[in-house]
Amino acid sequence: MLIRKASPVDSPLLAQLASRLWAQDPAELEPEFVNLTVSPEAACFLAFDGVVAIGFAQCQLRHDYVEGTSTSPVGFLEGLWVEEAHQRQGVATQLVHACEDWARSVGCTEFGSDCELDNGASLAFHLASGFEEVNRTIWFAKKL
């Protein structure tokens, strides 16, 4: 398995993988990944089994407050996806390590992430990866 930093030419591939995570049309996601792959404030990584992409991670700098942290900016894991056939084989862990290494390389001393309250698999992964749960939040909205 190979993990490498993505470049703008990888944007269609990133968009395909991300569409499985966020249930969005890859065509809508692709321009965003073009921007992310050239931004000094973000990084995307791809995992390959041979020549087949099997996962991705997106991380970026957050300058606003991140729960449980005391510095700024903070590296933040924005998205992580591994194809089902390759899950529980260390792929996600290696992708997160690549993001953490990137965050360190741009001067971060803290790294954050989040997950949905009902995503037990993500919670278990985060805890096993060394993250500590620091808060639980339910957001509300109403039309005016």
Question: Model features per residue range: what roles?
Answer:
Residues 11, 15-28, 65:
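Helix-loop element at the rim of GNAT/NAT acetyltransferase active sites that forms part
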Residues 25-48, 58:
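Active-site rim helix/loop that mediates acceptor-substrate recognition in acyltransferases
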Residues 46, 52-61, 76, 81:
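Conserved beta-strand in the GNAT
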Residues 70-84, 139:
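Conserved acetyl-CoA binding element of GNAT-fold acetyltransferases
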Residues 82, 88-101, 124, 128:
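Conserved acetyl-CoA-binding loop-helix of GNAT-fold acetyltransferases
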Residues 93, 105, 117-136:
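Conserved active-site alpha-helix within GNAT-family acetyltransferase domains
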Residues 96, 103-115:
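Conserved GNAT acetyl-CoA-binding A-motif
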